[in-house]
Amino acid sequence: MNKPFFSVIVPLHNAENYMRMALDSVREQDFTDYELIIVCDACTDSSEKIAHEYSDLVLNVNFGRAGLSRNAALDIATGKWILFLDDDDYYLPGAFRKIADALSRMPDIDILAYGFDWKNVGAVKQNHGQVFIAVWNKAWKRSFIGNERFPDWIHSDDLGFAKKMHPRAKFGFLDEPLYYYNFMRPGSVSDKIKAGEYDNSQFPDEILADVKGYEDWLKRLF
């Protein structure tokens, strides 16, 4: 059996009111060589029922951690490349084909970073072709990830994963927005962090100890 080109991983929690937008953006792509893995984490609404409308690969877990949900999906992913999609974000039309075309032009890279549009208090902004810490504006080579996994952190598991993966990766860049990031959805973790509701004491010591070193690496990269 041939492996799909992409494994698209979507962790979600009680997302019945907005998850269809995310999943429709996958279904409506004109590049269809992918598998869609949806991880319902401690869902008490109709999220799991909706998820089964879109994929046969639906996991039901009780982690309370986006990173651990992504790990569960990585354990069963068979795609050559991994894409991560948050449950309230979406891909722009044609994104998968553009990513696949870029990867065919850059066969030696481990990670492809691409641009994204994002909304912050009503204003749509753009970020193109930067590394950025988040996992969702990148395509990740499955063989490069290997057995690496997200840390068991309540917040900033993206940073923990990026710290392990970015410094040893060969990067490619696509200076075009392919992803829409809903930065300030009310009640989201990103909303709370932006509003300053979390202080440093709530983050693992590993984050606080290594952020400066990671920032120095980013400066060297650019």
Q: Model-predicted segments: where are they?
A:
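Catalytic core of nucleotide-sugar-dependent glycosyltransferases
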Residues: 180-184, 191-221
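Glycine-rich, basic loop-to-helix element that forms the pyrophosphate-binding segment
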Residues: 61-77
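Short aromatic/hydrophobic "clamp" motif used to bind/position activated sugar donors
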Residues: 82
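A conserved acidic beta->alpha catalytic loop
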Residues: 25, 32, 40-49, 86
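Conserved nucleotide-sugar donor-binding catalytic segment
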Residues: 123-196
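Acidic helix N-cap motif at the loop->helix transition within catalytic regions
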Residues: 17-20, 45-53, 90, 94
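Conserved donor NDP-sugar-binding/catalytic core segment of glycosyltransferases
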Residues: 90, 94-124
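N-proximal low-complexity "stem/linker" segments adjacent to membrane-targeting elements
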Residues: 1-25
